A protein has these predicted regions:
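Conserved catalytic core of Hanks-type protein kinase domains
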Residues: 43, 65, 147
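Conserved beta3 strand of the protein kinase N-lobe
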Residues: 51-56
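Conserved kinase catalytic-core helix
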Residues: 41-42, 46-49, 72-115, 124
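Active-site acidic catalytic loop and adjacent metal/ATP-binding pocket
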Residues: 14-18, 98-139
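Helix-rich C-terminal or lid/interface subdomains of diverse kinases
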Residues: 13, 58, 146-223
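Active-site Asp-x-Gly
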Residues: 123-161
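ATP-binding glycine-rich loop module of kinase domains
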Residues: 2-37, 41
Length: 223
């Protein structure tokens, strides 16, 4: 039986604790998470740190329960600085892009940022694979940079989150193995089509893209 009170809630799903080892995530719109679960099973099968899938039933996904703060939470408490957060974020993304993909391209997460990384005792684990697909790795790099820039500019997140996002953007740009600018326009288009964006986030998309270009030129002058 599903608990009545969510353990956590996102923009389009709720997460319920089933026991100490498992959680159930339910999509509010009723869509099946089967495709997402297949990607998660693929990456964990190749040793990548993502929650292990136990079952898919309708709109419900049962998976491992993770214990620890998100990377953003660790930044907020001062346990991780922006440079280290950038290294962790870029490192996970580089590892993901190095995995074999069924279609021969790269596996993209397309929502990889510090609030989707859980800092467990065994190491960082990447969650929320809803947007995952195959494609060009630089699109994923551009999306992460764009999200961080948006958070720093949108004015919908309480202090000190915008400042941490700005510093985290520089940390990410310093450590990523990809090109954050080459496919940035494509990332802007995908982000603009996201129905879960707040109006304030949509309003700063162009400015966020400009911020990525500016910071990439400053942090990665040799590119």
């Amino acid at each position: 039986m599903t608990p009545q009170t969510p353990l956590a809630s996102g923009r389009d799903a709720d997460v319920f604790a089933l026991d100490g080892d498992r959680v159930l995530r339910r999509n509010r719109d009723g869509r099946s998470p089967a495709a997402e679960a297949a990607v998660m099973a693929h990456v964990t099968g190749h040793g990548f740190p993502a929650p292990r899938v136990h079952a898919v039933d309708g709109a419900d996904l049962v998976m491992d329960r993770l214990h620890g703060p998100t990377l953003l939470g660790a930044m907020l408490t001062g346990g991780v600085d922006a440079a280290e957060a950038g290294r962790v974020t870029a490192g996970l993304q580089d590892r993901l892009h190095a995995l074999p993909a069924p279609g021969g391209g790269a596996l993209l997460h397309l929502d990889l940022h510090p609030d989707n990384i859980v800092m467990t005792a065994a190491g960082p684990v990447l969650i929320d694979w809803t947007n995952a697909r195959e494609g060009e790795a630089d699109l994923d790099v551009a999306m992460t940079a764009l999200i961080l820039a948006q958070v720093s500019l949108a004015g919908v997140f309480p202090p000190p989150v915008p400042a941490l996002a700005a510093a985290g953007l520089d940390g990410f740009l310093a450590h990523t193995g990809g090109d954050p600018v080459r496919l940035l326009d494509g990332a802007v288009g995908l982000r603009a089509d996201d129905p879960n964006l707040a109006p304030q986030e949509e309003a700063v998309l162009a400015g966020a893209a400009d911020r990525v270009r500016e910071r990439a030129a400053a942090v990665r002058p040799a590119d």
